[in-house]
Each structure stands twice: as C-alpha cells, then as structure tokens.
Amino acid sequence: MAGSPSRAAGRRLQLPLLCLFLQGATAVLFAVFVRYNHKTDAALWHRSNHSNADNEFYFRYPSFQDVHAMVFVGFGFLMVFLQRYGFSSVGFTFLLAAFALQWSTLVQGFLHSFHGGHIHVGVESMINADFCAGAVLISFGAVLGKTGPAQLLLMALLEVVLFGINEFVLLHLLGVRDAGGSMTIHTFGAYFGLVLSRVLYRPQLEKSKHRQGSVYHSDLFTMIGTIFLWIFWPSFNAALTALGAGQHRTALNTYYSLAASTLGTFALSALVGEDGRLDMVHIQNAALTGGVVVGTSSKMMLTPFGALAAGFLAGTVSTLGYKFFTPILESKFKVQDTCGVHNLHGMPGVLGALLGVLVAGLATHEAYGDGLESVFPLIAEGQRSATSQAMHQLFGLFVTLMFASVGGGLGGLLLKLPFLDSPPDSQCYEDQVHWQVPGEHEDKAQRPLRVEEADTYA
C-alpha cells in the first residue's frame, strides 16, 4: 500500500470506524422505528383473511429483482472501464448501494410511510430504496477514481436525505408525475455529482491521466453492465407504476425507446468517429439513454412512435455529448466527469423531464378515458388543467436542479474536509491505493507508486 505511515494508519481506521458507526446508527433507528407493513406482517395479513395470491410480493418482486440486478451488477460493471480501477468500481458500488438502501429506507419511510410512530416496509420500500441507491451511484460516476470510500459514504449520507426531500416535494407537494425517475433519479443524481465534481476539481489531475483510459478487456466487462441495464430498464421504469395498463404501457414505451436510442448511438458514433469507426464509450453509455429519456413520460400516452422518436433523439444527443461536450465541460467549466454522467443521465434526464411537460400538456379525457385517474389524478378530479399539470412538471425540473446543485455544493465542501482520506493526484484511478491487488508486489518493483503528496483541490 502506497503512502506515508500516517496516511496508511488513518486509512486503516477511517473506513472501519465510519462503517461501524453508520451501520450501528442505522440498526438502532431500524429497531426503534421500522416495522413490517400489513402485507408483510404475519398476524396482520392473516387477520384480514387475504389470499396469499393477492400479496403484492407476487406482483412487485419480479420487478424488484430486475432493479436490484441493475443497481448492483449493471451500475457496478458499467464503471469498470478504467484499466486499473475495476476493484474499486465494483466494490465501492457494492458498499455505497448497501448503505444507501438502508439509509433511504429510513429517510423515505419518515417522508412517505410513517404512521402510528413507525415506518412500515414491504417490497415497494425495497424498490424505492434501490431507486435512491441508483441516484447515489450516478453521482458516484462523476467522481469515480478521485475519492476515497469514506468520502463516498459521507456523500451518500447527505445525498440520500436530499433525494428523499426532493422526491417528496415533487411527487407529494407538486403532484409531479415521474414514473421512471427522469427527474428524481437521473437528473438529480447527475447534477448532484457534477456540482460535487466541480467543487472537488483537481487542477493537477493530469498526473493520473494515463490511468483514465480503458483497455480491451475492461471495455468488454463494461459491456456486461450495459447489457444488464439495457435488458432490465423496462422493469426499472415500470417497477412502481399501477398494475395493469399503466405498467404494461410503461414497459412498452421503454422497450421501444431503448431500441431506438441504440440505433441512434451506432449511427452517430460511426458518423463522428475517426475513419467512420465506432467508439465503445458511445455504445456502452449512449445506447442506454432511451430508458432515461422516457422515465417521466413512460406511463403517459406517449405512443410507440413517440417512444421511438424520444429514444433516437436521446441516443444522438448523448453521443454528441461524449464526443464534443465532455472535453469542454472539463476545460471550460472545470468539471471532471469521469463516467460522462452528464451525457448518460444529465442531458437525457432533462430531455425526459421536458418530454413529460409536453405529453402532460396534451393529456385529454378522450385520450385516456377512465385511465386518466391513474396517470393524472389531479386532472381527472378537475383540480388541474392539462396546461397546469405541464407547468407543475416544468417547475419540478427546476426544483430538482436546485436541490441537486445546492446539495452537490454542500457535499463537495463536506468531502474536502482535510482529515478525510482521498487519493493524491498522482494515484487517482488506481486500485492499489485502497485494495490488495494480485501481483501488486511485482508491479511495484517494476513501476512503484509515487510517494505521498498533498491533494490539490482547487
């Protein structure tokens, strides 16, 4: 392990103590507040003489399995493209998600399912917690390779709280419709991470630039993450929608949007690529934007054609972002976006929110019939017009951007505290800083890691 004895000693204690404290505090809060809901508690369920076939587990758990695989396998492997950071990409994804799902159960529980002095949990709580963990992992992608595990846990601690508040404001106070989380998950997670990355800007990061690229096998592993995410994204968007036509429509719209974004990505990648060749970075990421861009509108009457058009647009915009905007983001705005979350989640999330504004504004009783109540209950009840709902959708986007920006700024200041362990500029994107790597002794003998140096946050 590289570094001075003092840093090594601090690293040895910092992560264990923080993990023990967070897990202990979470366990105490669970003991005091968390209880099974009526669909999970043995006595309450059987007291009502329900048939086991009616339990929500049988309707929701298949979607939960897909979402869970996306969070732990999809996100984890999507970030293993860095040639010397695979352990950290998968391992820290595992760590962050495991903590975030516990902490978000509490935060979301206090906001959404707190009654009788307790938080009541079931399979929907598990899905919501995974959604929140997904937002945290999106933010992680923006600072991948430049932060230590203790910093990341503190980032999650703050972000989960702000995620829960933002979600509560949008869904419960503003009545925004966002079935697949274009705003609450993707836009929030992306811009929280981007602002965080800006605050943590490292002017001397060039010292580790040689590790920031991929190699052949790391790109292949990343494609595993891409395919997992691509396959399961219809379940992600439909996981918590109303059973029946709404859930069916959500999966269908996402399915077609993903297909179109993939073709758009291949087309643009070849068009802007050197000698007309495809860029694996584009394929790994931009092909997924079809799932992001229809997140808000997937439950609405978007139409299959609308889903195709939205997906194709998202794929092309994201590919152009990776090719042209990412370098500008770093050189002009000093945002070092390791995974390009602005192109995969940020821009497509904003486009998805704007698409939701458009589709909500076109909602009519004739188009939705009796299904209007499940998609736009306030319009069905006569409390809002379609135009008013569209304006609330637009305001929800601005609220999300505000929470994400302020939260990312606060998170950056928190993570810059001098006692928190982070890799020096010359050791970013390097597994050996935090992991025992097979063959590391031979590697050090040939090319030793640099001695300890100070971080250079701007």
Curated annotation (Swiss-Prot):
Gene3D superfamilies in alphabetical order: Ammonium transporter AmtB like domains
| Pfam families found in the cross-reference section | Ammonium_transp
Query: Which positions does UniProt annotate with glycan attachment?
Result: N49
Where do the TM regions start and end? 14-34, 62-82, 87-107, 125-145, 150-170, 179-201, 220-240, 252-272, 283-303, 305-325, 347-367, 394-414
An example Gene Ontology molecular-function term: ankyrin binding
Does the UniProt entry include the keyword Metal-binding? no
Which ranges of this chain reside in the Cytoplasmic compartment per its record? 1-13, 83-86, 146-149, 202-219, 273-282, 326-346, 415-458
Q: Where is this motif: Basolateral sorting signal?
A: 429-432
**Mind telling me how this protein is modified after translation?**
N-glycosylated.
Where in the cell? Answer: Cell membrane; Basolateral cell membrane
Tree of life domain? Eukaryota
| Membrane topology, as annotated | Multi-pass membrane protein
InterPro entries according to UniProt: Ammonium/urea_transptr, NH4_transpt_AmtB-like_dom, RhesusRHD
Q: Which reaction does it catalyse?
A: NH4(+)(in) = NH4(+)(out); methylamine(out) = methylamine(in); CO2(out) = CO2(in)
Region Interaction with ANK3: start and end of each range? 416-424
Q: Which residues lie on this side of the membrane: Extracellular?
A: 35-61, 108-124, 171-178, 241-251, 304, 368-393
Cellular component, GO, one term: spectrin-associated cytoskeleton
The biological process GO terms on file are: ammonium homeostasis; ammonium transmembrane transport; transepithelial ammonium transport
Keywords from the UniProt entry: Ammonia transport, Cell membrane, Glycoprotein, Membrane, Transmembrane, Transmembrane helix, Transport
Q: Where is this region: Disordered?
A: 439-458
Its function, per the record, reads:
Ammonium transporter involved in the maintenance of acid-base homeostasis. Transports ammonium and its related derivative methylammonium across the basolateral plasma membrane of epithelial cells likely contributing to renal transepithelial ammonia transport and ammonia metabolism. May transport either NH4(+) or NH3 ammonia species predominantly mediating an electrogenic NH4(+) transport. May act as a CO2 channel providing for renal acid secretion.
Q: Which PANTHER family does the annotation name?
A: AMMONIUM TRANSPORTER (PTHR11730), AMMONIUM TRANSPORTER RH TYPE B (PTHR11730:SF42)
The record's similarity note reads: Belongs to the ammonium transporter (TC 2.A.49) family. Rh subfamily.
Quaternary structure per UniProt? Interacts (via C-terminus) with ANK2 and ANK3; required for targeting to the basolateral membrane.
The name on file for this protein is Ammonium transporter Rh type B
Native source organism of the sequence: Gorilla gorilla gorilla (Western lowland gorilla)
